[in-house]
């Protein structure tokens, strides 16, 4: 079968036979992955980046380790393992930390300053069904409480016959933290975050936000101004004739004076990098996609929330725009906002979050710091999740005999630093990079 796949993800493009890069309706580059995906400067001009394996290879070469170009992670792992073995690398005992041997299921870990701060959202034994009536939920609950342990999974499981979107979820969000929510499609993430400001009110269990009980209709209405939710593709929330009117909609609904509404509109647009004077009178649908998304963000920020809930805010963005929005969210967090972010990108969660909660079949599967969660690649794989690209390569290198800590969270930069120390500190054997007949030719950017 012939396959043509469109993607923003370079690791996916690396698996193709050929790659065509488009810009403004024209083919900007075309060739094999090895010919295209290592051209860092040209890709950057097209708002794209290199695969993590190429970034790691380039970082190692800059540190004096002459590894060959590899666009696929498995090939880069094999290349580094070859260099390590060639240098006479001896096995080094790396002691695992306590978290290495600890299963993550429903675990709870303390995380930096946020662990000591006050709770802003407290979820206790929350369950939700989109299909069961109150009477049916009580009947189901009675069955589940009388069932033995072996049958409870069948009663509560997220199989096609299960009516439960959330199952007995207990969770605390603390002031000032950046909490990530991960999980496969259908795991309950979006249902959970819609409970955080009362868009969905609790059926069973409780949700308290900023001291207000969201089972109360009055309290749920009051908390909406303080817990802002930005949905996936938030630009689809835009509706007004001008940018200023759209951003002003929420504050006006609060009954604020017009001078305060105007202040909030200008302030929130500035926080997302937009100028009220330049675009305030424009129709939001005349703006670029990235600007539309920023306007939608501004509309939520104009409510001056204490908690910002983001449901896959980078969905559909190219790598450059993705980086811009991650920078924006990080800046808002550093300004004091508590952030809860749903994402399918393990790299984004690893780079941004203080703590990660993993959902599976409507329940909390794991909870911990990024390092604690991503140290358990096999457990995550069992529920259809991966780990960040640098972490994948570090774990694969450890399995290949390169002495790396499996309980440490690696970025590409940190992994390159540690590998350079290992590879350059091995026995005094000259480093060489074989370009053997039949091997993939080095590219112009990477070289051998």
Where is each model-derived feature located?
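The feature captures the beta-strand-to-loop junction immediately N-terminal to the Walker
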Residues: 182-184
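Catalytic Walker B motif of ABC-type/P-loop ATPase nucleotide-binding domains
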Residues: 308-311
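Conserved catalytic motifs of ABC-family nucleotide-binding domains
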Residues: 304
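Conserved ABC transporter NBD signature motif
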Residues: 205-213, 223
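Conserved ABC ATPase signature
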Residues: 283-287, 291
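Helix-to-loop junction immediately C-terminal to a conserved catalytic motif
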Residues: 197
């Amino acid at each position: 079968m012939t396959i043509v796949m469109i993607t923003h993800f370079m690791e996916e493009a690396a698996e193709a036979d050929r790659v065509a890069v488009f810009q403004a309706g024209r083919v900007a580059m075309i060739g094999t992955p090895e010919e295209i995906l290592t051209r860092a400067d040209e890709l950057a001009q097209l708002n794209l980046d290199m695969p993590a394996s190429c970034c790691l290879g380039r970082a190692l070469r800059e540190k004096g380790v002459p590894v060959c170009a590899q666009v696929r992670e498995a090939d880069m792992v094999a290349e580094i393992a070859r260099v390590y073995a060639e240098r006479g690398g001896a096995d080094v005992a790396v002691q695992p930390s306590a978290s290495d041997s600890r299963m993550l299921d429903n675990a709870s870990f303390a995380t930096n300053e946020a662990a000591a701060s006050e709770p802003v959202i407290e979820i206790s034994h929350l369950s939700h069904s989109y299909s069961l009536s109150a009477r049916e939920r009580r009947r189901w609950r009675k069955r589940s409480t009388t069932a033995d342990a072996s049958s409870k999974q069948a009663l509560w499981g997220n199989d096609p016959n299960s009516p439960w979107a959330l199952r007995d979820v207990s969770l605390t969000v603390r002031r000032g933290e950046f909490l990530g929510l991960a999980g496969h499609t259908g795991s309950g993430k979006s249902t959970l975050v819609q409970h955080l400001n009362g868009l969905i009110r609790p059926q069973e269990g409780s949700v308290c936000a900023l001291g207000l009980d969201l089972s109360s209709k009055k309290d749920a209405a009051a908390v909406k101004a303080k817990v802002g939710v930005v949905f996936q593709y938030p630009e689809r929330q835009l509706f007004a004739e001008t940018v200023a009117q759209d951003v002003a909609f929420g504050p006006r609904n609060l009954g604020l004076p017009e001078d305060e509404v105007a202040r909030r509109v200008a302030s929130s647009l500035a926080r997302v990098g937009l100028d009220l004077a330049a675009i305030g009178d424009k129709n939001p649908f005349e703006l670029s996609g990235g600007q539309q998304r920023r306007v939608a963000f501004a509309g939520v920020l104009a409510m001056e929330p204490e908690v910002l809930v983001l449901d896959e805010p980078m969905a559909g963005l190219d790598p450059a725009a993705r980086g811009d929005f991650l920078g924006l969210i990080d800046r808002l967090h550093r300004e004091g906002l508590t952030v809860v972010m749903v994402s399918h990108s393990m790299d984004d969660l690893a780079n941004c979050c203080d703590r990660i909660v993993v959902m599976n079949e409507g329940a909390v599967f794991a909870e911990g710091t990024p390092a604690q969660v991503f140290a358990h690649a096999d457990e995550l794989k069992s529920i259809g999740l991966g780990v960040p690209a640098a972490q994948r390569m570090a774990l694969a290198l450890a399995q290949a005999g390169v002495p790396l800590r499996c309980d440490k969270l690696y970025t590409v930069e940190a992994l390159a630093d540690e590998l350079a120390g290992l590879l350059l500190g091995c026995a005094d054997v000259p480093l060489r990079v074989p370009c053997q007949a039949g091997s993939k030719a080095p590219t112009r950017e990477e070289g051998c």
